[in-house]
C-alpha cells in the first residue's frame, strides 16, 4: 500500500483554493500534465492533475470542499515537499491553517506562507514524539 500525501486546511472557516483556480494554477506549474474533471456523483475530488502521464505518474487531487489537496503515486518525500510548498503558495493568507501530512498521519509540517520545500522537510514533526491531538486540540474535536 502506498502512502499518500495530504494538504488539509484545518480551520472550520478557511479554504485553500477553488477547483477552477486549482486547474489554472496546475496547468501553469505542470505544463503537459493531464487534467481530469469529475462530477459530484463520480468522486470526492473535482479536479485531478496527472503529472508525467506517460511515465511514473503522480496525481495531485483537489477536493470539492476546497479544504483538501492530496498527492499520490510515484513520488518520494522530497517531491511531496515540493508540492506542499506549491500548495501553500496558492493561498498566501497567513490565517489559513494548512498542514502537510501523510495518509497514515505519522507526522506533519505546518505550511506557513512563503515556506520552501527544504523548510517543509526540516520542520516535519514526528507524531510518535508529538501528539497532535494534545498539542493542537482546536483542530481535532
Located regions from the model:
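Short, extreme N-terminal segment that most often corresponds to the first beta-strand
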Residues: 1-32, 36, 138-141
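Arginine residue identity/basic-tract feature
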Residues: 29, 37-39, 43, 64, ...
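A generic structural motif
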Residues: 34-42, 98-104
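Amphipathic, interaction-prone secondary-structure segments
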Residues: 36-57
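Charged interaction segments
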Residues: 50-141
Amino acid at each position: 500500500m502506498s502512502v499518500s500525501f495530504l494538504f488539509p486546511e484545518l480551520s472550520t472557516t478557511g479554504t485553500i483554493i477553488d477547483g477552477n483556480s486549482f486547474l489554472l494554477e496546475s496547468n501553469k506549474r505542470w505544463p503537459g500534465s493531464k487534467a481530469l474533471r469529475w462530477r459530484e456523483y463520480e468522486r470526492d475530488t473535482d479536479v485531478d492533475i496527472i503529472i508525467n502521464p506517460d511515465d511514473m505518474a503522480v496525481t495531485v487531487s483537489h477536493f470539492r470542499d476546497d479544504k483538501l489537496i492530496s498527492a499520490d503515486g510515484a513520488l518520494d518525500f522530497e517531491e511531496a515537499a515540493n508540492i506542499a510548498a506549491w500548495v501553500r503558495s496558492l493561498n498566501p493568507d497567513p490565517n489559513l491553517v494548512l498542514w502537510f501530512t501523510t495518509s497514515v498521519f505519522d507526522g506533519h509540517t505546518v505550511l506557513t506562507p512563503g515556506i520552501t520545500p527544504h523548510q517543509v522537510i526540516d520542520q516535519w514533526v514526528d507524531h510518535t514524539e508529538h501528539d497532535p491531538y494534545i498539542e493542537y486540540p482546536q483542530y481535532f474535536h
